[in-house]
């Protein structure tokens, strides 16, 4: 879509210009090894590294002159191999930043890819070597790399029907999952009724609704916190499972009159989960033991974050947040590993900002401008299909995320989406209604709705950059945009996304 004719104003209140910038103010398993030794699976990892059977490459030939067997340039390979033994990829905005693609690329150079929090509300879209699209919600994005073991950690809430649907879809397309997906025995089970009461809860809130994905994430974490939740390990004890499920369903019926529960529902669910338990058994693993054993054996581990810091239960725009910790702290609590072993964290941020659902959005572009940016970037939720709200890159929020997580570097995604614009704005400062500057990202939602955003306006490049693979080949204005972001947040940008394909990535 050509959006070059549009100057995407954020409804400025006042505008001032200077030679360089203009500012505007805006309201803004181990398979079968769970009861034995974990070294068997780790040894298999080493053998796979020695005997790779498939070369995965992009459908588009990279322009770099020297590439490894996965289509990564020599400079890119050097950048990836410099990452620490335990590294992580986390979102810097309100989710949907494109984390899955980077994880998919990095996974080829790691032994293990692990999810530590969230559930099926995390939607990651990745592509295989034939360009086929996969939308994953529970299975880590590293699954397309057959040498990688994927771990679903104790901090994840697992909806078994959804997990099996993803596994079936992957295997029907030739992606082997047996022995490659390990599900923590400590992870909590998310039931269909959690999804039902998620909708009932939203209906209760009426106009104050949070805008959840209605995947049952919040209700499941609520069950966990009030200590009547059911864990994966409970599937091994079908003698007590019915009583635990009855208590859980009875509590839900007592709280929500609209939720109809009776003996027949319990019988049906118990029979259903007996079958699920049998199928899941080969995947169930003490992942805390597995992860720490892998660390001691110097295996490389990549942590794939779901959602993003601005949706964190503690640091996000509460209550318009998720129910877990998608920031750095969630890695340790969601996998059972020590803080001292966690090394490089890469923050993923779009070249602009999007948000799904309700909640403050200081740099949102209202009206036609937001609609055009949404269609140019195909901004529709992977999990829900809902249109995402769109706006300019919020430097204040990004700097806040960098402070919380201590990112070693950033991955700037979807830079190509801005290619048709004649000018691009960066939200660089928050001001109180009286004009005074806020020195931090506020927790007060009323203040977030009232504050004014000061923008810098940079020149656009108005040319197609999707085939470029070297940073120096980007138009000058595109490089100035990247470098201005680095300057404002104080964190280097090492990866730049310029398209959806696996190879559409610039290593800086």
Swiss-Prot record:
Residues in the signal sequence: none
EC number: 6.3.4.4
One CC-aspect GO term: chloroplast
Cofactor: Mg(2+)
A Pfam family that the UniProt record links to this protein: Adenylsucc_synt
Keywords assigned: Chloroplast, GTP-binding, Ligase, Magnesium, Metal-binding, Nucleotide-binding, Plastid, Purine biosynthesis, Transit peptide
Binding locations of IMP: 96-99, 121-124, 213, 227, 307, 322, 386
Localisation per UniProt entry: Plastid, Chloroplast
Reactions catalysed, as given in the entry: IMP + L-aspartate + GTP = N(6)-(1,2-dicarboxyethyl)-AMP + GDP + phosphate + 2 H(+)
The UniProt record lists the keyword Disulfide bond: no
Disulfide bridge positions per record: none
Binding site for substrate: 382-388
Binding site for GTP: 95-101, 123-125, 388, 414-416, 497-499
Family: Belongs to the adenylosuccinate synthetase family.
Function: Plays an important role in the de novo pathway and in the salvage pathway of purine nucleotide biosynthesis. Catalyzes the first committed step in the biosynthesis of AMP from IMP.
Oligomeric and partner information: Homodimer.
Protein name: Adenylosuccinate synthetase 1, chloroplastic
């Amino acid at each position: 879509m050509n959006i070059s004719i549009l100057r995407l104003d954020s409804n400025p209140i006042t505008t001032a210009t200077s030679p360089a910038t203009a500012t505007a103010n805006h309201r803004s398993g181990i398979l079968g090894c769970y009861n034995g030794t974990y070294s068997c699976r780790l040894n298999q990892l080493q053998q796979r590294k020695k005997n790779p059977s498939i070369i995965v490459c992009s459908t588009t030939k990279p322009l770099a002159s020297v590439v490894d067997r996965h289509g990564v340039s020599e400079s890119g390979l050097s950048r990836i191999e410099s990452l620490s033994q335990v590294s992580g990829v986390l979102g810097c905005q309100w989710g949907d930043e494109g984390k899955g693609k980077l994880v998919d690329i990095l996974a080829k150079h790691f032994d293990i890819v692990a999810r530590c929090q969230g559930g099926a509300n995390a939607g990651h879209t990745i592509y295989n070597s034939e360009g086929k699209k996969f939308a994953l919600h529970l299975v880590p994005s590293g699954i397309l790399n057959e040498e990688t073991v994927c771990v679903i950690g104790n901090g994840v809430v697992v909806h078994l029907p959804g997990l099996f649907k993803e596994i079936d879809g992957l295997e029907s397309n030739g992606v082997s999952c047996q022995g490659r997906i390990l599900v923590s025995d400590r992870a909590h089970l998310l039931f269909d009724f959690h999804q039902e009461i998620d909708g009932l809860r939203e209906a209760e809130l009426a106009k104050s609704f949070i805008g959840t994905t209605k995947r049952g994430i919040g209700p499941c974490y609520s069950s966990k916190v009030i200590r009547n939740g059911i864990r994966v390990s409970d599937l091994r004890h079908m003698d007590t499972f019915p009583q635990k499920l009855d208590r859980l369903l009875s509590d839900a019926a007592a709280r929500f009159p609209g939720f109809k529960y009776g003996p027949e529902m319990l019988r049906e669910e118990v029979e259903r989960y007996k079958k699920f338990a049998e199928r899941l058994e080969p995947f169930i693993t003490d992942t805390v033991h597995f992860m720490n054993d892998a660390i001691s054996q110097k295996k490389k581990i990549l942590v794939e974050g779901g959602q993003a810091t601005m949706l964190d239960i503690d640091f996000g725009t509460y209550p318009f947040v998720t129910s877990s910790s998608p920031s750095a702290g969630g890695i340790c609590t969601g996998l059972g590993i020590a803080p001292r072993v966690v090394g490089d964290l890469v923050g993923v941020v779009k070249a602009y900002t999007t948000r799904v659902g309700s909640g403050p959005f200081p740099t949102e572009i209202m009206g036609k401008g937001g609609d055009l940016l949404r269609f140019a970037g195909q901004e529709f939720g992977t999990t829900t299909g809902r249109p995402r709200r769109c706006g300019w890159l919020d430097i204040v929020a990004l700097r806040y995320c960098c402070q919380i997580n201590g990112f070693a570097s950033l991955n700037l995604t979807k830079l190509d989406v801005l290619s048709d614009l004649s000018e691009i704005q960066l939200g660089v400062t928050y001001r109180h209604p009286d004009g005074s500057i806020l020195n931090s990202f506020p927790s007060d939602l009323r203040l977030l709705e009232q504050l004014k955003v000061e923008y810098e306006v940079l020149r656009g490049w108005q040319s197609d950059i999707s085939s470029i693979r070297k940073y120096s080949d980007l138009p000058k204005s595109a490089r100035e945009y990247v470098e201005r972001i680095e300057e404002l947040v104080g964190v280097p940008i090492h990866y730049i996304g310029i398209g959806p394909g696996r190879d559409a990535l610039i290593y800086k």
